[in-house]
């Protein structure tokens, strides 16, 4: 049937900030949906709080609201559009993850959707309830002829304990309506049951948990299905988890299609999945169903269902080329599967199920090193921060590619020293799921363990173990062969081994370069195959490629002949990780779109299945490949070889994807690959402290005193000369990796040892730490002559908090005209001194009226999307054009940049935008179950960001906090405990809270100071202080755990006070989901936000409206 004619205006809800369990796959799906709906002539309103998303670019919706995704704010959007005579007809909430779904449910249940006549499309309320509510779903599975794990839904701890007594330990605890397994876990004791179920009841919006029998160790599978209004159903993809049940699917290595199912088992799973889909009632969209199979007897049970586009949907889309989100959006507005044409073939309908003639492997990326003390055991609560995907003609080829795509310290088997111990130690490690267990599987096999013993220890299916065992056998051949001949080398490449891995086994080849030389001499290059959804039955219209080393030397590549347009290769940012996330993908996507429009043929290279950059229609050609020197060079080689004539490859862009492509710049340039934009030598100049220090001295720009050290003695001497505290860090890092503020010699000695191990080829940098300075961030463009200031951001937290974790305001709220003039002058001098062509990010610290230069990065920064949204100027697009030869004057004339002026000075009536970091502390626990510390420092820990934008700072800050963590309290009790150095600064904000009606609790020293300043407060004792007669009986931590505290202000004591007490306070706040502020500036900002909330005049405005006010550039 044709699309519905009664729908004219659709509201799409995004997923908000990148968090563990809900990442940029929903930007990918939401962007597709918005494109589809607008192409169909529908008006689109969008709500999403994440400025780093492509979907919040103004061109993707008619009304783009960068506002908190809460029922209250979404209702304001619906009401505003209705008041303007532009009624919203339908709400599409199935493409924004659990956040969007929960918000839609709340709007339905509160009567808001009925009040404004808004229909839920994609999945109606009943379908959502049937799919998400544990008990109802269990009944549906039984009705469909399936089986669920024995379980019971519990609403109280008494019911939980009763159920555990019936089922026996261990049990699995699962809250309803949460994502990423938040609050779930396997409980082996009654204490663990109490802890997990208590947390689960708190995490579930519906305040219930499912207690179910443990199926730990069973095999796990997923099906991605779609259904239309005529009851046509397609199974898009089957996915198998390599890790068994007990490890969250987001933390497991997964494979598509499923490898170890028999045809009978697959058909049974498929039939049951379709029956469940029909019973649940998802009739215009997609869903994901998870199954478990007992490897001993084949018993099949249904675990759960997501009645929406999920993380696995994005993986299935990229794995098959079947655009699930795009088709789901079309189904939601009335189309049927047979009416939708498959974009990739251009002739088959969407009711044709995809067929794969390749294997896809996804692997998770973790960040445990960022959270010392966190338990690294993998459980049913998701902990990975990103993922990589690869495609190959066989499992081991795809596995090898994905392992090097992760960009960890190990780039595949045999690329790092083995851990100590023998077979038994390796098998012992395998019994506890943890990051990198594939390496232990290979090691145990190499040391002589049988496939059966390794399978028993790990719970991994013997088929996968046997595949890795074949690699062990191949390794033995490679080591033993007298000469590495063409046949053996081709076989090694066919099995996914990199030149680096082969070089580690053949020392006589003198490293990776030697292996490459031999390969080139023997004519061994990969061929590039095409993802076409139909195993080559129909010709693909969209060039989406992956590499494979075929055993047949005559195998042909499928890269299309080159056009007459010059080509530009854009290197993406790889898997998301802390310090390098969606913000860099945003810049890569902007480069692809603007350069295509400017007459270039754009070629994207990336390996992240969650991103918009790896959508098949973002660039003119896509290579789903690891971002290593070898793999990128082969793509360049393939592009140069594809067809004759034409201008060839104009250059490679390394400046937009973060540290990953930047780290390849020198080697690529040395190999003859043209790097466009800022040259590699200039990048080196900015990274080299000595050379950069000379540049600053020549320009008369102050910088904190510093020194470089390779030994503890050198570091101690430098620290004594410049004075403690000092900031120590390794060179060439992103996200503040390994940074620390050091207050004394003992701490310095411990750091030097660790830092040297972290980056042995680079020295340690020791800087004077500027306490109480205001940190400033600047994004600027330079075309080699003119500098354009994109935006000047003032950090809310003081210097010492990593810029990625600090909230910031744009335009700056406390900087004067003279400060901004200093910033402009310094930025221009640095851009010209380095030789920047493209983007530049500079960080400054302002202390006692002196502007110090902290660092300069001649590349796209993580703040580029935020600045672009706040100022209406697309900096990444302008950067891409400049790198390919355009001037700032030319871009002003075209309207891409402001015709006059730049982002250094905002219009008088410009709104204030606040960026806030989103931190994942609640996801991690120590081995004893306690929460980890939420203290911020120079090492970045945030996974994502939100933006609040309004007419004044208080309102914008309030929005940013609501979007990131939930509303700031408007009343209640605030607990205050601060370091001596912060007590004077805290008097005003705490007094204001007391005047607003808050009750103040404080520990003895802080309470005494507050009372002396006329602030009434009640005492609580410190956590480790014993109870004494006449002293408070309740400790600060007791009060927080008892739910008597609504906000915590706790600044750290450095090395001069009771740090352990601060940890207990902050971790209790994290565990109770209570706002916890750890800086004086953060407390002052929070007070302004609370005041704005109490005034109650915080409204909503679309970006399009705000950009007209700013007088920015229409894109």
UniProtKB/Swiss-Prot annotation:
Chain positions recorded as ATP 2 binding sites: 729, 768, 770, 775, 800-803, 843, 855
Region (Carbamoyl phosphate synthetic domain): 560-965
EC number: 6.3.4.16, 6.3.5.5
Residues binding Mn(2+) 1, per UniProt: 290, 304
Residues given in the record as Mg(2+) 4 binding sites: 855, 857
Gene Ontology biological process terms, A to Z: 'de novo' UMP biosynthetic process; glutamine metabolic process; L-arginine biosynthetic process
Binding residues for Mn(2+) 3: 843, 855
UniProt: Mn(2+) 2 binding residues: 304, 306
Keyword Magnesium: yes
Catalyzed chemical reaction(s): hydrogencarbonate + L-glutamine + 2 ATP + H2O = carbamoyl phosphate + L-glutamate + 2 ADP + phosphate + 2 H(+)
Binding locations of Mn(2+) 4: 855, 857
Pfam families: CPSase_L_D2, CPSase_L_D3, MGS
Needed co-factor(s): Mg(2+); Mn(2+)
Region named Allosteric domain: 966-1115
Keywords: Amino-acid biosynthesis, Arginine biosynthesis, ATP-binding, Ligase, Magnesium, Manganese, Metal-binding, Nucleotide-binding, Pyrimidine biosynthesis, Repeat
One MF annotation (Gene Ontology) recorded for this entry: carbamoyl-phosphate synthase (glutamine-hydrolyzing) activity
Positions of region (Carboxyphosphate synthetic domain): 1-407
GO cellular component labels: cytoplasm; plasma membrane
Entry binding sites for ATP 1: 134, 174, 180-181, 213, 215, 220, 246-248, 290, 304
Domain notes: The large subunit is composed of 2 ATP-grasp domains that are involved in binding the 2 ATP molecules needed for carbamoyl phosphate synthesis. The N-terminal ATP-grasp domain (referred to as the carboxyphosphate synthetic component) catalyzes the ATP-dependent phosphorylation of hydrogencarbonate to carboxyphosphate and the subsequent nucleophilic attack by ammonia to form a carbamate intermediate.
Membership in a protein family: Belongs to the CarB family.
The name this protein goes by in its record: Carbamoyl phosphate synthase large chain
Lineage of the organism: Bacteria, Bacillati, Actinomycetota, Actinomycetes, Mycobacteriales
């Amino acid at each position: 049937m044709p699309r519905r004619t009664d729908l004219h205006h659709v509201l799409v809800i995004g997923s908000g900030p990148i968090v563990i369990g809900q990442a940029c796959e929903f930007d990918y799906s939401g962007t597709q949906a918005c494109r589809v709906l607008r192409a169909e002539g529908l008006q689109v309103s969008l709500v999403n709080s994440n400025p780093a998303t492509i979907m919040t670019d103004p061109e993707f919706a008619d009304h783009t609201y960068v506002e908190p995704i809460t029922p209250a704010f979404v209702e304001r959007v619906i009401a505003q559009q209705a008041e303007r005579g532009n009624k919203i007809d339908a709400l599409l909430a199935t493409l924004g993850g659990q956040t969007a779904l929960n918000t839609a449910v709340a709007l339905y249940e509160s009567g808001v959707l009925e009040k404004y006549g808004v229909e839920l499309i994609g999945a109606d309320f009943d379908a959502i309830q049937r799919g998400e509510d544990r008990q109802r779903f269990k009944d549906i599975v039984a009705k469909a002829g399936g089986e669920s794990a024995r379980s019971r839904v519990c609403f109280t701890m008494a019911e939980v304990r009763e159920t555990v007594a019936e089922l026996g330990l261990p049990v699995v605890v699962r809250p309803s309506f949460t994502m990423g397994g938040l609050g779930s876990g396997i409980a082996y004791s009654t204490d663990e049951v109490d802890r997990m179920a208590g947390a689960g009841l708190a995490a579930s919006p519906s305040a219930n948990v499912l207690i179910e029998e443990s199926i730990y160790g069973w095999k796990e599978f997923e099906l991605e299905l779609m259904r239309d209004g005529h009851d046509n159903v397609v199974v898009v993809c089957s996915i198998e988890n390599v890790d068994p049940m007990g490890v969250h699917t987001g933390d497991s290595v997964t494979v598509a299609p499923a490898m170890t199912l028999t045809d009978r088992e697959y058909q049974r799973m498929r039939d049951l999945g379709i029956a469940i889909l029909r019973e649940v009632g998802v009739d215009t969209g997609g869903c994901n169903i998870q199954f478990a199979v007992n490897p001993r007897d084949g018993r099949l049970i249904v675990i759960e269902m997501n009645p929406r586009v999920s993380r696995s949907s994005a993986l299935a889309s990229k794995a098959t080329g079947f655009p699930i989100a795009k088709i789901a959006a079309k189904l939601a507005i009335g189309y049927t599967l047979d009416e939708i044409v498959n974009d990739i073939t251009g002739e088959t309908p969407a009711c044709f199920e995809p067929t794969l003639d390749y294997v896809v492997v996804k692997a998770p990326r973790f960040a445990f090193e960022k959270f010392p003390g966190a338990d690294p055991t993998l459980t049913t609560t998701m902990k990975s921060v990103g993922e990589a995907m690869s495609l190959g003609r066989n499992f081991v080829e795809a596995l090898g590619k994905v392992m090097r795509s992760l960009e960890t310290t190990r780039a595949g088997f045999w690329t790092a020293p083995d851990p100590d111990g023998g077979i038994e130690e390796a098998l012992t490690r395998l019994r506890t799921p943890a990051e990198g267990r594939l390496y232990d599987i290979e090691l145990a096999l190499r040391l002589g363990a049988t496939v059966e013993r390794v399978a028993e220890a790990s719970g991994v299916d013997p088929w996968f173990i046997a595949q890795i065992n074949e690699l062990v056998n191949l390794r033995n051949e490679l080591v033993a062969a007298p000469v590495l001949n063409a046949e053996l080398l081709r076989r090694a490449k066919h099995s996914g081994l990199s030149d680096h891995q082969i070089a580690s086994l053949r020392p006589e080849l003198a490293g990776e370069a030697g292996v490459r030389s031999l390969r080139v001499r023997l004519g061994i290059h990969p061929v590039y195959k095409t993802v076409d959804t139909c195993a080559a039955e129909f010709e693909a219209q969209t060039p989406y490629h992956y590499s494979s080393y075929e055993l047949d030397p005559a195998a042909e590549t499928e890269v299309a002949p080159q056009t007459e347009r010059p080509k530009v290769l854009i290197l993406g940012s790889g898997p998301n990780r802390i310090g390098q996330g969606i913000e860099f993908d945003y810049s890569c996507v902007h480069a692809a779109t603007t350069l295509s429009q400017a007459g270039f043929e754009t070629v994207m290279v990336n390996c992240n299945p969650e991103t918009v950059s790896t959508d098949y229609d973002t660039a003119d050609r896509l290579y789903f490949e690891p971002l290593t020197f070898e793999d990128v060079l082969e793509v360049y080689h393939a592009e140069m070889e594809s067809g004759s004539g034409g201008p060839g490859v104009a250059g490679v862009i390394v400046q937009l994807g973060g540290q990953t492509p930047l780290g390849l710049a020198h080697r690529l340039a040395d190999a003859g690959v043209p790097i466009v934009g800022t040259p590699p030598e200039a990048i080196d100049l900015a990274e080299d402290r000595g050379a950069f220090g000379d540049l600053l001295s020549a320009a008369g720009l102050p910088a904190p005193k510093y020194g470089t050290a390779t030994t503890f003695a050198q570091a101690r001497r430098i620290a004594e000369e410049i004075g403690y505290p000092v900031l120590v860090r390794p060179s060439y890092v992103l996200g503040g990796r390994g940074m620390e503020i050091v207050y004394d010699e003992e701490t310095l000695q411990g750091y030097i040892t660790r830092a040297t191990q972290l980056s042995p080829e680079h020295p340690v940098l020791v800087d004077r730490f500027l306490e109480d300075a205001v940190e400033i961030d600047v994004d600027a463009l330079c075309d080699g002559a003119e500098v354009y200031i994109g935006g000047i951001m003032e950090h809310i937290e003081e210097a010492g908090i990593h810029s990625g974790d600090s909230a910031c305001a744009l335009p700056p709220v406390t900087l004067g005209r003279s400060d901004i003039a200093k910033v402009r002058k310094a930025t221009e001098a640095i851009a010209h001194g380095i030789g920047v062509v493209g983007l530049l990010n500079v960080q400054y610290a302002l202390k006692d009226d002196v502007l110090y230069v902290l660092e300069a990065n001649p590349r796209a920064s993580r703040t580029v999307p935020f600045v672009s949204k706040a100022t209406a100027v697309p900096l990444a697009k302008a950067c891409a054009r400049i790198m390919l030869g355009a001037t700032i004057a030319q871009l002003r004339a075209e309207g891409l940049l402001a015709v006059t002026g730049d982002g250094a000075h905002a219009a008088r009536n410009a709104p204030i935008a606040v960026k806030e970091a989103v931190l994942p502390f609640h996801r991690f626990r120590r081995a004893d179950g306690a929460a980890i510390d939420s203290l911020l420092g120079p090492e970045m820990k945030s996974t994502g960001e939100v933006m609040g934008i309004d007419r004044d700072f208080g309102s914008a800050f309030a929005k940013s906090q609501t979007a990131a963590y939930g509303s700031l309290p408007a009343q209640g009790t605030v607990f205050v405990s601060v370091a001596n150095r912060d007590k004077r600064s805290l008097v005003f904000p705490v007094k204001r809270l007391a005047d607003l009606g808050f009750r103040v609790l404080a520990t003895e020293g802080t309470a005494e100071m507050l009372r002396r300043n006329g602030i009434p407060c009640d005492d609580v004792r410190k956590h480790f202080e014993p109870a004494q007669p006449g002293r408070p009986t309740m400790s600060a931590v007791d009060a927080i755990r008892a739910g008597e505290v609504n906000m915590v202000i706790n600044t750290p004591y450095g090395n001069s006070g009771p740090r352990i007490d601060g940890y207990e306070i902050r971790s209790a706040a994290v565990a109770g989901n209570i706002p916890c502020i750890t800086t004086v500036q953060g407390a002052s900002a929070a007070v302004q936000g609370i005041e704005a909330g109490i005034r109650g005049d915080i409204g909503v405005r679309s970006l399009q409206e705000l950009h007209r006010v700013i007088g920015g550039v229409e894109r």
